[in-house]
């Protein structure tokens, strides 16, 4: 056999054989326990970068490992094919986005196959296929019928020069400019579709069935932002009610001014003539900013705002409070108005200091009085002061008392507020799922009949920016007849947010050729939820949250029985350039996986990506590291295939047997917890030991063969091609990937003997070898008889003898 492993020959050979023999074919009806593993599907942007490899190859390793453990594993792959990059490429290069996308899919699929992934490509889904997005449209209609889809006016980013809406990704820089023409981006109100994710807000806060990283559940919890408090009604001096939501109604007497969101509908009505110019200018500037910018807590960022020239009345103190507008108050949170309590809220305090507004203490801590000056905001609970009838109550008691008083006086009510907003799904783009709704002047909004789905995305559409949705400008597509009355009607010309495509694809994988339903329910009932999901943590509050919402909606429709889409989630880290910076073409630090595969082979690239460091942390690329993995696989190859010139040294078969059983346990435990780097480190040490043992008389024995077979089996999930070649070399005809994971004997994991340091008065004076099962008296006896220890204790009084099991012996003398 060749003395060196040639990946350019071996890897294509085995991939062809896997395909021919169908060893990865999905078998939904198998009696084996199921394991459904999914990695987030890629966008077909042109080619796989090293980040795709870093996300996908370890996921493939874990799936292979679970298969060898006896599970019926399903590990599918597909493409998130709709979206902005295809449309941008089409505009820039005068291309058909469909041809661009499907050409990329064909190329990327070849790359994924070269990775050696355990994928049944008959189960592939492509979200731009009409047979896929047909069911996006079907779900939309079901949501509409159930009240989960509705339409309302809302603001979108708008480029006045390009005359079009912009997606979030097209707004760049701190000044929020259009990426196409560099114009300042503004806002525009459009009538758009929403999914009512807020209907599931409380249920989405329940993570009890999820084995997910704490940072992800924390991000979702904060994003949903459930707050308990009260809605309180202030009135302007002109009599207009202004409702605020507060989590601290106990501080109502400390509200010394009010702040409205610049977009609040009362701003225009209440603004005085003297303040109108200043208010209008501030509103125009504020609405250009993102919510993130407006809610920044950066201490160095100056607080901005404008008094509108009007006052409201505090319903508790009856004091006049000035009404301001400021960009840190959002119409999308609460009521779009706040009562400002600068004494006990840091942002209100900074605002009051900036503009010279009154600050009043209404809560004290121990050793403070009602007159103690406020040097900074004090948000902590305490004892209420300067608050009329609730003086002396604790903050918690006062909170309840104020809510009861508000309800009795019809000035407010107990309320729960959420930061979460409903999901805006309308997009004024071309390359997406057409929204299946029809507008009839007689019948109103009517869904496309389900037997007419899919509503196909038309070809020959001019998607150059004009200020309208591209489908609206198609000469015929938008004109139709009402399915209810038969009269003239028009289609909705927006397309869906592409997060719709990725909210349920995990279910479609199970039956991608089903034509009568989005998926085959019997298969879904058996295989759901997903057992293992992998992908980036950047999807915490969009894709992952939207998927959970979609799942609960499907459950309530009777389509699935599971409460959650995936049980276990693992997030991989980010692979960096050699300079430890994020890879980018501008930095010149991008790693091309195709070149690496051509030079080293897919197995080497897979191995290094898992050896580079803890998978959940990521780390910088290191060319020296990949050379080390080349040497490791070469040594593994040689230890199995080469015959040593001499192997007559005396060896210890029992030691090799123990090492073999230990490495089985270690690699299995490590792969189960996605600790790929330590699994590979263990295999490297095992190969080094085998290189030594093969020069002894243990070489060629049953123990040796068991060790080399074990090495091959343990390598199989990590380096699937070379493992096949080694397995065949060892005389096996069936694929290594159809073999069982090797078992280990618990008794062989324990050392026959162990080495213990011996301390005298806390200082190490020697070491002893004892049986691993030795009891304390025999360990003490061995220590006292040791040739180094015995002279040191001779003639001394032994005060104490301490044995720390498996760690040390300490003898105290005087």
Curated annotation (Swiss-Prot):
Coiled-coil intervals, chain numbering: none
Compartments, record wording: Cytoplasm
One of the record's GO cellular component terms: cytosol
Superkingdom field: Bacteria
GO biological process, one term: leucyl-tRNA aminoacylation
Residues annotated as binding ATP: 585
Family affiliation: Belongs to the class-I aminoacyl-tRNA synthetase family.
Descriptive protein name: Leucine--tRNA ligase
């Amino acid at each position: 056999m060749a003395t060196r492993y040639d990946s350019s020959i071996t890897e294509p050979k085995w991939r062809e054989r896997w395909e021919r023999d169908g060893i990865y074919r999905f078998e939904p009806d198998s009696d084996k326990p199921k394991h459904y593993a999914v990695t987030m599907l890629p966008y077909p942007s042109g080619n796989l970068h090293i980040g795709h490899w870093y996300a996908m190859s370890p996921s493939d390793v874990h799936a292979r490992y679970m298969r060898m453990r006896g599970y019926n594993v399903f590990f599918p792959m597909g493409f998130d094919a709709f979206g902005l990059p295809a449309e941008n490429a089409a505009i820039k290069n005068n291309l058909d986005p469909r041809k661009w996308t499907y050409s990329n899919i064909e190329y990327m699929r070849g790359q994924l196959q070269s990775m050696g992934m355990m994928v049944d490509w008959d189960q592939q889904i492509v979200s731009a296929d009409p047979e896929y997005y047909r069911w996006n449209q079907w779900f939309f209609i079901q949501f509409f019928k159930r009240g989960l889809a509705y339409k309302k006016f809302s603001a979108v980013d708008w480029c006045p020069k390009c005359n079009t809406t912009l997606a979030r990704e097209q707004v760049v820089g701190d000044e929020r400019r259009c990426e196409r023409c560099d114009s300042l981006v503004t806002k525009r109100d459009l009538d758009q579709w929403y999914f009512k994710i807020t209907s599931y807000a409380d249920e989405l806060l329940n993570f009890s069935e999820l084995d997910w990283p704490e940072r992800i559940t924390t991000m979702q919890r904060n994003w949903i932002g459930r707050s308990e408090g009260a809605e309180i009604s202030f009135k302007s001096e002109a009599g207009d009610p202004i409702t605020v939501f507060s989590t601290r109604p106990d501080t109502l007497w400390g509200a010394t001014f009010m702040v409205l969101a610049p977009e609040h509908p009362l701003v225009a009505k209440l603004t005085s003539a003297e303040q109108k110019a200043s208010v209008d200018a501030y509103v125009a500037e504020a609405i250009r900013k993102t919510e993130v910018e407006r809610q920044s807590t950066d201490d160095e960022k100056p607080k901005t705002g404008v008094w509108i020239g009007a006052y409201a009345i505090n319903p508790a103190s009856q004091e006049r409070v000035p009404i301001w507008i400021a960009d840190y108050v959002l119409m999308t949170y609460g009521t779009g108005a706040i009562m400002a309590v600068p004494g006990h809220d840091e942002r209100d305090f900074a605002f009051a200091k900036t503009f010279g507004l009154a600050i009043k203490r209404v809560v004290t801590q121990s050793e403070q009085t009602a007159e103690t000056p406020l040097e900074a905001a004090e948000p902590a609970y305490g004892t209420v002061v300067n608050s009329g009838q609730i003086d002396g109550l604790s903050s918690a008691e006062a909170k309840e008392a104020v809510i009861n008083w508000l309800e009795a006086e019809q000035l407010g009510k107990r309320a729960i507020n959420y930061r979460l907003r409903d999901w805006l799904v309308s997009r004024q783009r071309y390359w997406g799922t057409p929204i299946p709704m029809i507008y009839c002047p007689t019948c109103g909004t009517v869904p496309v009949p389900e037997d007419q789905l899919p509503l196909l995305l038309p070809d020959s559409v001019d998607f150059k920016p004009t200020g309208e949705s591209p489908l609206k400008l198609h000469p015929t597509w938008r004109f139709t007849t009402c399915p209810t009355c038969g009269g003239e009607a028009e289609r909705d010309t927006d397309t869906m947010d592409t997060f719709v495509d990725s909210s349920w694809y995990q279910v479609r994988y199970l039956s991608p050729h089903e034509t009568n339903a989005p998926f085959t329910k019997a298969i879904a009932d058996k295989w759901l939820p997903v057992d293992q999901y992998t992908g980036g943590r950047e999807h915490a509050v969009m894709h992952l949250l939207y998927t959970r919402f979609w799942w609960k909606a499907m459950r309530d429709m009777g389509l699935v029985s599971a409460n959650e889409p995936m049980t276990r989630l693992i997030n991989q880290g980010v692979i960096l350039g050699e300079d430890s910076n994020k890879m980018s073409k501008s930095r010149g630090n991008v790693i091309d996986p195709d070149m690496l595969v051509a030079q080293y082979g897919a197995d080497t690239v897979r191995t290094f990506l898992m050896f580079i460091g803890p998978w959940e942390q990521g780390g910088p690329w290191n060319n020296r590291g990949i050379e080390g993995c080349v040497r490791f696989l070469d040594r593994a190859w040689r230890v199995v295939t080469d015959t040593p010139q001499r192997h007559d040294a005396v060896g210890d078969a029992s030691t090799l047997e123990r090492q073999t059983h230990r490495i089985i346990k270690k690699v299995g435990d490590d792969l189960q917890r996605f600790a790929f780097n330590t699994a590979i480190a263990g295999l490297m040490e095992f190969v080094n030991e085998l290189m030594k043992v093969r020069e002894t008389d243990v070489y060629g024995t049953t123990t040796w063969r068991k060790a080399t077979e074990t090495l091959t089996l343990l390598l199989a999930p990590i380096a699937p091609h070379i493992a096949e070649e080694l397995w065949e070399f060892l005389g096996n005809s069936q694929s290594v990937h159809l073999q069982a994971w090797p078992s280990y004997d618990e008794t062989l994991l324990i050392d026959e003997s162990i080495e213990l340091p011996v301390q005298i008065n806390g200082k190490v004076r020697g070491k002893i070898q004892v049986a691993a099962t030795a009891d304390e008296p025999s360990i003490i006896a061995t220590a006292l008889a040791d040739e180094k220890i015995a002279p040191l204790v001779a003639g001394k009084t032994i005060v104490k003898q301490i044995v720390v099991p498996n760690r040390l012996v300490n003898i105290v003398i005087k």
